[in-house]
């Protein structure tokens, strides 16, 4: 009887233990977050966050994925193959308005990654005809070259930042944009295409302007910071699911990137950053070209000498000025689409900006990181254009050059 009782107690105890085991939930490992990038110097915040272990520090497992073009980045963000990417600030605006994709598709702008650091490169056809920042001579130079052949310029994505810098330069120079060809070429392919005479000029990010000068294929005519000092350039752009369902993970990613941006703005760290960027799995361009322009030293090519940028080279943090995603900047890009004929009527400027800019999320992250949030919706002016008031786009469009 006692033996039977002991066996019963043993079975009950074992059953209880097994029940405890089966009900115990083993924590699931953190999912891998995939972020895309293009081979450009300004992918540095993502690369640095990875190489310094900052993503791991903030508790996220991030895989960086090198992409072939901005169109591929767009498609992978939208279909969920990647969670987000180093991306042209204006690309979500271009896609949403139907310029660079199917209208109504949403990609969210979480934060700005950098200011400045792009340029317009002209081919050797222009060498000796127009020099560095000689915008007033550019139209005559184009006509000069057109006397020998058709002139084509390249940018990287319709409605993207490079497209808009190129068109702003043309407007300032008085170049009729319908008199030249404008084509789309992925950033890493710019130099090769100029080498085989597929275009006479292009607008792209570094290091591909510096590489053209170093290889004596073209020269730097003007940098983007000369067109608009401290302009927004690349952004962390994410799909809607990452911005909502995985909001806490996104915040961790943003914190890691902000710390990387701070690290990058210590000039003494830029040589190390360049040594990472030069690797084949990242930018795959000459170390000396990446490093020099990252430090603000531009060997222009065409025997034009070296231009030293003292405070408006490529910046990633700049005491907190860089990273706030601004609705006013989004509205400016939307206004450019109307200005240059991409859109035939005014879009819902504020509505689109509010839909695509994650300014509230950035404010949360900034507060937790003690990063200042910059004021928004204020008027500002670019170098060659009239003042832009985001609250009165109509007045701007009446007076700006087209």
Locate predicted features.
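Secondary-structure end/capping motifs
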Residues: 245-358
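Bacterial N-terminal signal peptides that target proteins for export
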Residues: 1-10
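Bacterial N-terminal signal peptides
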Residues: 9-20
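Conserved C-terminal helix/tail region of periplasmic/extracytoplasmic solute-binding proteins
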Residues: 331-402
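Short glycine- and hydrophobic/aromatic-rich loop-to-beta-strand nucleating segment
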Residues: 120-121, 235-238, 242-243
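Soluble non-cytosolic domains of exported or imported proteins
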Residues: 40, 67-71, 86, 157-161, ...
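Short, glycine-/small- and polar/acidic-enriched structural segments
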Residues: 26-177, 181-183, 196-212, 217-230, ...
């Amino acid at each position: 009887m006692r033996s039977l009782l002991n066996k019963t107690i043993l079975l009950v105890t074992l059953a209880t233990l097994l029940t405890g085991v089966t009900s115990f939930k083993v924590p699931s490992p953190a999912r891998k977050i995939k972020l895309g990038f293009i081979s450009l110097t300004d992918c540095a915040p993502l690369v640095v966050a990875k190489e310094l272990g900052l993503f791991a520090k903030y508790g996220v497992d991030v895989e960086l994925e090198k992409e072939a073009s901005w169109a591929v980045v767009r498609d992978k963000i939208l279909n969920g193959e990647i969670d987000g990417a180093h991306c042209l600030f204006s690309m979500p605006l271009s896609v949403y308005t139907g310029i660079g994709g199917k209208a109504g598709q949403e990609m969210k702008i979480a934060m700005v990654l950098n200011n400045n650091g792009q340029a317009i490169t002209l081919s050797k056809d222009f060498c000796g005809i127009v020099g560095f920042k000689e915008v007033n001579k550019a139209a005559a130079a184009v006509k000069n070259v057109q006397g020998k052949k058709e002139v084509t310029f390249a940018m990287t994505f319709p409605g993207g930042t490079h497209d808009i810098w190129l068109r702003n330069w043309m407007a300032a120079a008085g170049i009729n944009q319908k008199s030249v060809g404008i084509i789309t070429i992925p950033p890493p392919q710019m130099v090769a295409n100029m080498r085989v005479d597929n275009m006479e000029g292009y607008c792209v990010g570094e290091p591909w302007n510096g590489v053209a000068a170093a290889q004596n294929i073209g020269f730097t005519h003007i940098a983007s910071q000369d067109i608009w000092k401290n302009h927004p350039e690349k952004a962390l752009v994410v799909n809607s699911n990452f911005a909502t369902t995985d909001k806490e993970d996104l915040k961790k990613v943003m914190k890691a990137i902000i710390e990387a941006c701070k690290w990058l703005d210590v000039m003494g760290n830029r040589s190390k950053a360049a040594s990472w960027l030069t690797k084949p799995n990242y930018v795959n361009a000459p170390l000396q070209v990446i490093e020099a322009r990252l430090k603000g030293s531009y060997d222009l090519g065409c025997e034009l000498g070296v231009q030293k940028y003292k405070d408006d080279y490529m910046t990633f943090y700049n005491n907190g000025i860089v990273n706030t995603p601004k609705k006013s900047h989004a509205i400016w890009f939307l206004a450019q689409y109307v200005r240059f004929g991409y859109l035939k009527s005014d879009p819902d400027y504020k509505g689109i900006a509010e839909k695509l800019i994650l300014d509230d999320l950035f404010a949360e992250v900034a507060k937790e990181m003690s990063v200042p949030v910059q004021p928004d919706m204020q008027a500002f002016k670019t170098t060659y254009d009239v003042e832009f008031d985001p609250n009165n786009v109509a007045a701007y469009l009446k007076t700006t050059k087209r």
